[in-house]
Amino acid sequence: MNAAKVLEDLKRRFPNEPEYHQAVEEVLSTIEEEYNKHPEFDKANLIERLCIPDRVYQFRVTWVDDKGNVQTNMGYRVQHNNAIGPYKGGIRFHASVNLSILKFLAFEQTFKNSLTTLPMGGGKGGSDFSPRGKSNAEVMRFVQAFMLELWRHIGPETDVPAGDIGVGGREVGFMFGMYKKLAHEFTGTFTGKGRELGGSLIRPEATGYGNIYFLLEMLKTKGTDLKGKTCLISGSGNVAQYTAEKVLEMGGKVLTMSDSDGYIYDPAGIDREKLDYIMELKNLYRGRIREYAEQYPGVKYVEGARPWGEKADIALPSATQNEINGDDAKKLIANGVMAVSEGANMPSTPEAIKVFQEAKILYAPGKAANAGGVSVSGLEMTQNSIKLGWSAEEVDEKLKSIMKNIHEACVQYGTEADGYVNYVKGANVAGFMKVAKAMMSQGIL
């Protein structure tokens, strides 16, 4: 395989999809050496088959707002690869959603799901609809219209969606209800459901908790842990909230959180009481993070910025893709950051990743570090299939074990000659090899 040529061909065939190209380039650049040890892969044109989605559904979603106006949005579902299990990946509702972003997310999801060792393929879906500022009734009407198109393409053994940015328990509940009405069946077609619908305990917490479990495994390699360490967290949604919760539980100090308007810096630290305030502000009142600075004296609020210029020991990007650029990464290194562990999907640009790796700090890519969410989704699928529910303690122990195993796989495939662990390479090669072998065993499809 010539990675540069493969990428050039993809850019020619699928122009104007920069996020998708970025995700493919990151994977190809790290697996090329391992791939070329297997000439049978080239003979089967494996890399091209793996880079291009199995299928993409694109559709119009028409709904009526509270004023009686007819609104139109675009809906998508990218079914990327099902070599090791049914398509699995979230649904995102955000104004920025487009096909390029969803193709990148589905591509990443394929390898992330492979790393968990659970039988799940990769997919992703969503819409450019934003729930922000919409009434509960408007969100319900949109979701029901969205499901009128999507329902026939999903199912417990075909494609199992979940939540993502803009899609929480409320939206998953509406989707599940509409699917049940249309399909005439009560099955585990969605994960991230409420407990009353067959959802799993620890699922809301899983991505954030899993990120910290992975971080702890990395820190162990340096003979340390989180006690007394200061952390920068971006975002203030589900992932950021439970990342912060687990940091506090492990003895760390959270200095920042953010939203799309700006970030807060609390030199005293965001403690349990303050985190509860943020959870209530965001989950119940759907407020803005600046209100935290109005609530607590001594807190700095920076409009229109991200927290990466602040001094801390650890950075935990938990908001969105490409939120840390090369300049941000240089600031983090200059300020003494020893570890970056990604709760969001691809939050660091290629330039930022290069800075982290050249500085030889601990850097965990999202496909490894944030695999906790989809891991517990997989455990939810298992519980649904056997018609049983596990305790929170059981699920949490399984999550810890999965994250530890992912870390071990990254170390196995990513340790370089000088002993530095390239977690990007390790995650990509480990995830790729399982999918590649499964595809080869199934013939040319």
Where does each model-flagged region fall?
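Flexible, glycine/charged-enriched surface loops at secondary-structure junctions
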Residues: 21, 37-44, 117, 154-163, ...
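Phosphate-interaction motifs
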Residues: 59-120, 124, 128
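Glycine/serine-rich phosphate-binding loop and adjoining beta1-alpha1 elements at the start
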Residues: 94, 113-227
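Rossmann-like adenosine-cofactor binding region
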Residues: 262-363, 368
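Glycine-rich phosphate/diphosphate-binding loop of Rossmann-like nucleotide-binding domains
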Residues: 194, 198-311
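Adenosine-phosphate binding glycine-rich loop
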Residues: 1-23, 218, 318, 333-445
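Structured beta-strand/loop patches that form or line metal/cofactor-binding pockets in enzymes
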Residues: 40-71
